[in-house]
Amino acid sequence: MEYDIAIIGGGPAGYTAAERASENGLKTILFEKNAIGGVCLNEGCIPTKTLLYSAKILDSIKSASKYGIVAMKDPSFDLAKIIDRKNKTVRKLTLGVKARLTGNGVTIVEGEARITGEEFGNIRIHCDGKEYLVKNVLVCTGSETGIPPIKGLSEVKYWTSREALDLNDLPKSLAIIGGGVIGMEFASFFNSMGVKVKVIEMLPEILGNMDKETSAMLRSEYKKKGVEFFLNTKV
């Protein structure tokens, strides 16, 4: 099977490039070893915002009396249903991206692609036992989660954002190393779910890329909710 262009990696860069290439008349094939949509859709922006919306509803019920609404003082929640809703949301959007790609004539291959050589001026790619010949290759493989070199970390069971998104049970307490956007999103969610949260940040303030006044205001609001902060702290 021959193609004008192969794109390795089905994240935002990869699937957008595949769509544009196909729209411009190129016979296009897209390889993805995990899930179409990349980190943002499957393990980042979308799932975290879905979880945070559930947390927002829970917080709203808890504070309903402020607005003259009589509600349960201690509303409960079903973690399994919260996670299931998150998974369904991600699945729906992933299927939407796939449908858009196939509708534009892009061939999608789910598996790990390997460039194995050249043949008559074409590049040879193997994936799941099949061979593909392409004229051009665009690599959009993204990145992996960076694990800091913390002494003893490899000896304990730690989470990255990936594990934190697929839970069966909530921990009683949680230390979050890093007070950036991702860290604070998880701090907000777990705090709303009743988990005792501590945020450890090596910089003088959380959300270091934001305006200092905004970061300080957000930290103050989180502290009111019970989140503990350790700034200027290295682990």
Role assignments for model-derived ranges:
Residues 157, 168-205, 209-210:
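Rossmann-like NAD(P)H-binding beta-loop-alpha module
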Residues 8, 87-88, 177, 209:
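Residue-level marker of alpha-helix boundaries and capping positions
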Residues 4-30, 183-191:
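N-terminal Rossmann-like FAD-binding beta1-loop-alpha1 element of flavoenzymes
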Residues 195, 223, 227-228:
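Conserved acetyl-CoA-binding loop of GNAT-fold acetyltransferases
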Residues 8-9, 31, 139, 177-178:
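Conserved N-terminal Rossmann-fold NAD(P)-binding element of oxidoreductases
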Residues 80, 199-203, 230-232:
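Short beta-strands and strand-loop turn motifs
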Residues 112-114, 180, 233-234:
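Conserved acidic residues
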Residues 1-3, 19-26, 31-170, 203-207, ...:
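Glycine-rich flavin
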